[in-house]
């Protein structure tokens, strides 16, 4: 059984609307999601002793989510990740997007899907959010109807994304939750054991745009096919952290993507997805200045993201899996976050 409760989370400034919070609860998980950015604000998971802790980074109040912050828990779009120089050409026409990450456009632009109010609909086992992204929003062509559905099933949180376009446009939707399986507010993720089911990754240039090469993980820091303890692994390979797309094996059906185990608590997160890639990000840009839930500071490497996605900058790299959605087609992807103890 899943219970769904609805409450006011806060009011937007200047009478711009009321943000609601939806609490989904099963016998194993409790998830809070708000209608601002379809944002996961809390996710309580039991450890091997049966004690529940909140394992996602975020804020207690709406104000936290309205300030400049690194997409904690939000759905990002119209195109997640980076588009080089914020431009792409479609049917001979060049489109210019908002530049908001060095020379590039990141996560949909200045006012992406994470910074808008969505319309909620309560389901028996979850909540569905919808919105219409108008033609030209953040520079993207065509109107885009979008639905994001969160449902609970025991220890599994399922996120389904659907979209329909009035004209051809790139679409790439993901959730940007930062996890710490020791509990949010824990100082780092070095004691997490990580596995990612990928034989290849995308090397990036100095502004984190893929170079176009699809590189084998063999013999590199990116070989996470067997479990590695993150802290030791980063030290051993002298890397500052990960912020890279891993190219997932398998077909467009549900595929295993990643597993993270925190030995101290016993908590395990397994991720499955229909998407062709996952951005593994280790919170390299967190610096402890934002005050999170219960006053927690979030320093570098205090959370990790597994952003299931199409490959970054695919709209400019024709040999990457396609990201264009045409009128009459439906974008439809699902990601499963499965929690357990071991």
Swiss-Prot record:
Protein name (database record): Galactose mutarotase
Active-site annotation: 176 (proton donor), 307 (proton acceptor)
Record text on subunit structure and interactions: Monomer.
Reactions accelerated catalytically: alpha-D-galactose = beta-D-galactose; alpha-D-glucose = beta-D-glucose
Chain positions recorded as beta-D-galactose binding sites: 81-82, 107, 176-178, 243, 279, 307
Keywords: Carbohydrate metabolism, Cytoplasm, Isomerase, Phosphoprotein
Entry annotated with the keyword Ion transport: no
Family note: Belongs to the aldose epimerase family.
DNA-binding keyword on record: no
Top class in the EC scheme: isomerase
GO molecular function: aldose 1-epimerase activity; carbohydrate binding
CDD domains xrefs: galactose_mutarotase_like
UniProt pathway annotation: Carbohydrate metabolism; hexose metabolism; Carbohydrate metabolism; galactose metabolism
Principal subcellular localization: cytoplasm
Organism: Bos taurus (Bovine)
Subcellular location(s) of the protein: Cytoplasm
Any one GO cellular component localisation term in the record: cytoplasm
Phosphoserine, modified sites: 124
